[in-house]
Structure formats: structure tokens, C-alpha cells
Amino acid sequence: MTQFTQNTAMPSSLWQYWRGLSGWNFYFLVKFGLLWAGYLNFHPLLNLVFAAFLLMPLPRYSLHRLRHWIALPIGFALFWHDTWLPGPESIMSQGSQVAGFSTDYLIDLVTRFINWQMIGAIFVLLVAWLFLSQWIRITVFVVAILLWLNVLTLAGPSFSLWPAGQPTTTVTTTGGNAAATVAATGGAPVVGDMPAQTAPPTTANLNAWLNNFYNAEAKRKSTFPSSLPADAQPFELLVINICSLSWSDIEAAGLMSHPLWSHFDIEFKNFNSATSYSGPAAIRLLRASCGQTSHTNLYQPANNDCYLFDNLSKLGFTQHLMMGHNGQFGGFLKEVRENGGMQSELMDQTNLPVILLGFDGSPVYDDTAVLNRWLDVTEKDKNSRSATFYNTLPLHDGNHYPGVSKTADYKARAQKFFDELDAFFTELEKSGRKVMVVVVPEHGGALKGDRMQVSGLRDIPSPSITDVPVGVKFFGMKAPHQGAPIVIEQPSSFLAISDLVVRVLDGKIFTEDNVDWKKLTSGLPQTAPVSENSNAVVIQYQDKPYVRLNGGDWVPYPQ
């Protein structure tokens, strides 16, 4: 009888060590809710392993309590890993820059992460869990959902749920001088200027496509002449590189109908800035004469043919460098010189009026004053050919008026900048000077934010940040363009700007009786939308955006 009692007691003694997930149920329920709303880059297997660690039976209650203490930092790290927030590598790489932010700006950034609707929903979920857990074993449902999510992703990354045999849409475009046929470039099919997108969007296929893209881009460059023709007409090139301006920002600010946009001769409607940070953006623009390179290669020496302003210097254009700020934050001026090949002295900033203070407290100069100084300086040049790079940041997040800690209203700043630029255009027209002005934003300001990033955060170069308005205007022409701007809809990037400059190098566009605008703007290089920062890559594949963080799996960008 005694032996029988011991045998039946053994199973019950094992069951008593299965204590369930307890409070960790709420942790997983919150994750499921955020996942359902599209706010997480959820990793099913890691979460299942974490749940198994929490469920593993331990005979001693002290060990059970110790496990909970150990699980706290693990759970926090896993939650962070499941979000779209910047990873440790990004935070470390940007640490010195974050340290330069003013206290008021840091507080402003932190408050943007507070979503009261989300907090309210989590509170309701907490009450529901506390109520239902009195009668229902929530752990069973949590484990079942985790298992289901893992089954869904056995064949690929999270949310890559396309069947292997599903038909896909092939993106076929023609650009540059390419024919509308598939050609072989490094063993990969290429349609026009861009690698073909025929394979299903799995992680392996997207990685292969990205490698093919960079291999194809490495073979592209603008062809500058060795010298200008004897009858070439001198003119000036002014490239205005404005920070924090995208089509999404303009729409959010309600300035799509500003008259400035109707005054350009040429307008790029589908231009990709390829990054969401200032330093890399400036380097890409200054290296516009070669195809797009990876973020890492931006900080490696490039072929001499890649530097747009250096190419112009060889043809007799005098270089000028202007900034609407001091260029010190993040070593911006140093990057422009070392990686962008811009060796010209910074134009004198003495006595320029300060209209704003940056997020780090540095001065932001009045654009009208800077542009007027450019007019004065270049007018005194002995050389009538010049190429000027002007970087300005009146729209940067965190800019505020002197004596005021609150970030200045974006719409008011954008309205002022557009008005000033429009007035400058009028002044240039009156001057009679032959000038080609190219307005190229660095990147957008993330004015609206999305499910991955709050307003102002640009760690991930999303399409709404990198789709920027680019405009070209010619002044001093004998036969100026009439009517609405010529709109270029094809996917473009910096190589198209370089090619456009090459097409007008002889300056005859300013003296011709009739300008063939169609010939000037047709067949410019197309570039597939690929954007990259140090820890994030975003591509457009089969008309859908995909993102890869820290070299992990590709997932669809949350819409």
C-alpha cells in the first residue's frame, strides 16, 4: 500500500513546479497587441525561447524567484530588440552627437515617444488580463500564440509569408541610354539602369538583389569632357543643399502650392536622397558623378572621377563653399572636405545675422544674407565660371529662436525659406547673370513620423524621409523656359544631377534661340530607390518598401 502511494505522488509533485508565466503573460500580451498594430519587428523564435526559459520547472522556489530577477534585463533587452528603436550600435555611433543636444531638445525628443492612446490601450489590456486570469489560464493562450507565430515564419523572416510559388510583379523600367531589354551585369539580370525584380521577396533574394544593385552602380559614372569647346559660354552653378525637406514634410506643412515650386524649369518628383543623415547626404551629392555606393564605402576613398565639383574645377570652374551654419556639429565640415572632396575655403560668415539657434545651440544664419553675400563674392571673381556648394539647415528639427527653448514651428520656417528662395530667384533674374541653380535636399525631417519612428527620428531612412523635392532653374537665358516645370517622374538620384550638369557644360543653353528641353531632360540615369544608414537599409522591391536592420532579415516596411 505504501509503495502504491509513493508512485502516484510522483507525477503530482512534478506538476507543482509548473508555475505558468504569471506576470510575464502581460508582457507577451502587450507585445502581441503592438505586433497586431504594426509597431514591432517581432522575433518569434527568440520570444519562444524566452517563454520556455520562464516556464522551465524549478523545484526550489528561491530558484524560481532568482529566475524572475534574471529575466528582467533579458526581457527588457528583448522588448527593445523587437521594436524599431535604434540598436546599441546606432546609439553608440551617434552617442557623441546626442551628447551635443541641448537639454530642452532632449526633453522634446523624449516627450514625442509618449503616445497617450497607446498608454490607454495598455491600461485596458492590463485590467482585462487581471480580470480574466482569475478563471482562465492565460499562459496556455500565450504559448499557443507564440507557437503559431513560429509556425508561420518557419520558411522565412517575420511576416515574410509569401508562398514559394506565388506569382510576382516584375518591375521593368528603362533609363539612361539603356534599351528596354534585360542585359547581363555581373551575372545578374538588369533592366535598363536597375537590376530586375523578378524573384519572390525573401531575405536571400533581397540580399542578392541589393548586391546586384551595388555591383551595377559601381560601373556607372558621368562622362565629363577633357576640356570645354572654344565657344563655350561661361556660367555659374549654385547647388543648394537644404536639410530636412521631403515631399512628405511639404505636404504635412501645407506648402505644396507655394509659388516657388512653379518657378523651377525642371522638377524631379521621384528623387531618392539615399540616406537620412546630413553627412552621408552631402558626401553622396558631392560624389554625384558616380553610381550609388553603400554607406560603408562613403567613408572610403572614391575614384577621382566621382567628385562633381572636382570634375568642374578641372574644366575651369572656381569652387566656392558656403554654409548657413558653422559646420561643426558631427564633424560635418570635416566630412565634406575629407569624403566629399570639397577643398575650397568656407565663405566668410562674419556679421551674418543669426535668425535661429540649432538643437546644439549653434548659430543658424539668415539665408537671404548668405545668398546675398554669395552674389557679392562671386561678382568680384575674375573667373566667370564658378561652382558653389551651399549647405543650409533652417528647417532642422530642434531649431529655435534665440531666447526661446521651444522648437520653432516647421511650417513658419519652411514658409520663410521658400519665400526667401523665391525672392532670391527674382533677384537673380533681374541681375542678368547666367546661373544654373540646383536645389537638392539632404533628406526629409520626418515631420509626420510613422509606425517605426516618431516625428523627428531618422535612424531608419524610410521612403517618406528620402523622397525629396529636387528643382533646377536656369537664369540669364536668351530663351527661358515657359510654362509649368518639366516633371521627371522616373526614379532618380544624384547621378541624374551630374549628367544634367554635363549636358549644359558648354553653356550654350543660355544663348540659344530655342532650347530643346525634351532632349535636355530625356534619358537621364534612373536609380532604384535604395537608402542606407549605418545600421538600416530600405529598398523598394516590386513596388513595396522593405527594411533590414543591423544585417538581419528583411521585413516589409510597416505602412
From Swiss-Prot:
UniProt topology in membrane: Multi-pass membrane protein
Cellular localization per UniProt: Cell inner membrane
Disruption-associated phenotype: When the bcsEFG operon is disrupted in a cellulose-synthesizing strain (a strain K12 / W3110 derivative called AR3110 with a restored, functional bcsQ gene), cellulose is no longer made.
Keyword set includes Cell membrane: yes
Transmembrane segments: 34-54, 68-88, 113-133, 138-158
Keyword Cell membrane: yes
Domain of life: Bacteria
One of the GO biological process terms: cellulose biosynthetic process
GO cellular component terms attached to this protein's record: plasma membrane
Other information: Cellulose production is abolished in E.coli K12 / MG1655 and W3110 due to a premature stop codon in bcsQ.
Name of the molecule in the record: Cellulose biosynthesis protein BcsG
Organism: Escherichia coli (strain K12)
Organism placement in taxonomy: Bacteria, Pseudomonadati, Pseudomonadota, Gammaproteobacteria, Enterobacterales
